[in-house]
Design a protein with these regions (language model features):
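Active-site-proximal alpha-helix that buttresses catalytic centers in soluble enzyme cores
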Residues: 1-125
Length: 125
């Protein structure tokens, strides 16, 4: 029964901003994940200008017992962070914690459901 012992963590990764209010939508996504699954282990992390960073967020989940961590990049487009920085950071996490199963979701902007939702919002009159 290995599955019962497995603790899965989710890191919602966003760009980051010095403006504290900028984080509110990211934190709202985390709150929604928890509403849908109160047992979820979800944290927010930021590429720059805000804390925690990805390494610190992963370290916190691992300290809490996570054996698998899924990183969900909350980016609309495949910019430099998603294309270059994130793969390097994920590689560093895998090297720092080889016992943890890290996975990377595709950027949310590539998810058909989000594209459809944004189109519906844009088309509202």
């Amino acid at each position: 029964m290995t599955m019962a012992a497995e603790m899965r963590g989710i890191v919602l990764l966003a760009h980051g901003s010095r403006d504290e209010r900028w984080r509110e939508p990211i934190e709202a996504v985390a709150a929604r994940v928890l509403k849908d699954d109160p047992a979820a282990h979800v944290v927010c992390a930021y590429m720059e200008l805000a804390t925690p960073d990805l390494h610190s967020a992963a370290a916190g989940l691992i300290a809490d017992g996570a054996t698998a961590i899924r990183v969900v990049p909350l980016f609309l487009g495949m910019g430099k962070h998603a294309r270059e920085d994130l793969p390097l950071q994920l590689d560093a996490l895998c090297k720092a914690w080889p016992q943890v199963d890290f996975s990377l979701a595709r950027i949310v902007g590539e998810e058909p459901e989000l594209v459809e939702l944004l189109a519906r919002i844009a088309a509202k009159s």
